[in-house]
Amino acid sequence: MSALMKTDPEIAEAIRLETRRQAGKLELIASENFVSEAVLEAQGCIMTNKYAEGYPGKRYYGGCEYVDIAENLAIERCKALFGADYVNVQPHSGTQANMAVYFSALSVGDTILGMNLAHGGHLSHGSPANFSGKFYNVVPYGVDRETETIDYNQVEDLALQHKPRMIVVGASAYPRTIDFEKFRAIADKVGALVMADIAHIAGLVATGLHPSPVPVCEYVTSTTHKTLRGPRGGLVMCQASYQKTLSSRVFPGVQGGPLMHIIAAKAVAFKEALTDEFKDYQSQIVKNAQALAKELIGRGYRLVSGGTDNHLLLMDLTDKGLTGKEAQESLDSAGITVNKNGIPFDTRGPMVTSGIRIGTPALTSRGMKEEEMRTIARLIAEVLEHRDNEKHLMAVKEEVGRLCQNFPLYAERIASA
């Protein structure tokens, strides 16, 4: 009997069930992924016991010589991965990384430009519900109604009109390549700083499959999960001249002690990301997303912007007579996990929506390729077109189960679950 089962059987059972859920369903949420056993091992290590306020070599606690090794490895590997001057691996999340940048570069009430959440942006880019929308004067930009891609002319017009202190670039539901050079040129016209949040596309950026913002932006933030396939956490990079202020805004500005077991796991993930195999994996993510998109379009589904350049796609269900919420629930009942998502100019609220967001990082981690994506597109279409037919949904669920068995996940853990 495991220590956890003996101490807390309720939590042990929840973990067992979640293990089986992940292994037995098709995970298509764009922000989720499956970390390696090595990352899991590091994340669950005894470094969780160590307090280490401060930075390597400059801690407020004794006994940090070995956690310093882990943090220095994470920093140097991340620098090599992105070609950054300065990296801070302590942020607990992407939002806290963004917060550290804001507190480093802005004063309360300063004007920032950020992508409209309803057009694919992120809460921490100026949503009124988030601290960023409460502390700063936020001017949202969005996508063009016809192309559904970022309207750079609008961005420039807004920048010239409002003279922002910072332009925030990045998205949580945008399927196309972001032109960081254009944002840099616009910012230079008004003397603005640029922060790029690459949380969703970090793996693609690290492997050269998406243009990098690091050479052209003062600040770059990211999560360490999603396409980077590391533990849940954040990081922030900046040009050398900003590092002293930024480091003091991470600690003690917005955080106390870093999570050293998570930083150790970040170091492992960064090492994995520096391999040729990881580049092949990222390339396959994009191939899979594009294969999935092509098959869905062929089956009569409209995708926002007409397709994808990266790891995700947005399905517009407006003309299908169902909401994103209904689609998510129907697909989940058949073993396919997606999330309801607003589409640009959506008339439905965020808890209902007119679309769903689909991503390929997790299934690519399982080894699935274009052939499986075409099968999955067919299964998605069958569920949405026969969502009231219980017999049909069960047939899809059985096919999903067979597909998952052919691409096993965490085999040893499943065997003991």
Swiss-Prot record:
GO molecular function: glycine hydroxymethyltransferase activity; pyridoxal phosphate binding
Positions bound to (6S)-5,6,7,8-tetrahydrofolate: L117, G121, H122, L123
Positions bearing N6-(pyridoxal phosphate)lysine: K226
Pathway involvement of the protein, from the record: One-carbon metabolism; tetrahydrofolate interconversion; Amino-acid biosynthesis; glycine biosynthesis; glycine from L-serine: step 1/1
One cellular-component annotation, GO: cytosol
Alphabetically ordered keywords of this record: Amino-acid biosynthesis, Cytoplasm, One-carbon metabolism, Pyridoxal phosphate, Transferase
Pfam family, one: SHMT
Location(s), subcellular: Cytoplasm
EC number from the UniProt entry: 2.1.2.1
Cofactor: pyridoxal 5'-phosphate
Subunit (UniProt): Homodimer.
Similarity comment text for this entry: Belongs to the SHMT family.
PANTHER family to which the protein is assigned, alphabetical: SERINE HYDROXYMETHYLTRANSFERASE
Protein name: Serine hydroxymethyltransferase
Gene that this polypeptide is encoded by: glyA
